A protein has these predicted regions:
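Extended alpha-helical scaffolding segments
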Residues: 1, 6, 17-250
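Cys/His-coordinated zinc-binding microdomains
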Residues: 8-11
Length: 250
């Protein structure tokens, strides 16, 4: 009887997930021609670092350094600080310059009539596709692998690199940590840069890097999730951070 019902908290978590991993099987768009978003998190080769306790894990992944954009330092601007109309208009720029905005970015405009919400009954929501974030412009994302594109519409830019099904994380070691002197066509994940910066304060010299991502189907008209990919890589900090000529990273 209740397999299709949600509590209020479940519904809110579902809405958050929906914005990050939507696919493109829905049909409704605004009048303008644009590529619809599948959800920003959906396109990432997600990585994060775990410590020996919750505090370490939070500190290892909490990159508090904000990079300037030109001469300006971006102000953190999550979606709830804007009206619905402002968020929709903002989505058509294809850009986000701050992590709070990126992590609360809308892939869909969703209307739920608050007067009609009754979690004992079926809910009706109205959904409209919003434009894709430009992957070449969102390099503030700290929790993804990156690849340098040499041809096509993203030529000469870095874009997030998704994990490959059946491929162990250790095979991506060469793009998790980048040797000194070859940074031009290689981009290190932001959480690894941050971890190296704070490692002098960390007594735990063993590091566990985790990979997580959703795989979508091969149909370009749906992009429905079909599989979750999870892996991890445990290693000593020396292996990760010795990047000079005599170091481990080469």
């Amino acid at each position: 009887e209740y397999k299709s019902k949600m509590s209020e908290s479940e519904f809110l978590r579902w809405l958050i997930m929906l914005q990050g991993y939507f696919g493109i099987s829905d049909k409704v768009k605004f009048d303008e021609e644009y590529k619809a978003s599948i959800g920003w998190q959906y396109g990432l080769g997600g990585i994060f670092v775990t410590g020996q306790n919750l505090f370490e894990t939070l500190m290892f992944n909490f990159k508090i350094i904000v990079s300037s954009v030109g001469e300006n330092v971006p102000i953190q601007n999550p979606c709830w600080e804007n009206s619905g109309k402002e968020n929709i208009n903002k989505s058509f720029s294809g850009l986000e310059d701050n992590l709070a905005g990126l992590y609360t970015n809308w892939s869909r405009a969703i209307l739920v009539n608050s007067k009609d919400i009754d979690f004992s009954e079926d809910l009706t929501i109205k959904v409209v596709k919003l434009p894709l974030l430009a992957p070449t412009m969102i390099q503030i994302e700290p929790m993804t692998l990156w690849k340098y594109v040499k041809e096509g519409e993203n030529k000469n830019h870095f874009i997030p690199k998704k994990h490959e099904q059946g491929q162990a994380l250790w095979k991506s070691f060469g793009i998790i940590t980048i040797p000194s002197g070859i940074e031009g066509e290689h981009k290190e994940p932001g959480v690894i840069e941050w971890l190296e910066r704070i490692q002098i304060y960390n007594d735990n010299k063993f590091i566990r890097i985790n990979a997580v991502a959703l795989q979508y189907d091969s149909n370009p008209k749906s992009r429905m999730p079909i599989n979750e990919m999870i892996d991890d890589l445990a290693l000593h900090e020396i292996v990760l951070f010795e990047k000079g000529k005599e170091g481990w990273v080469m």
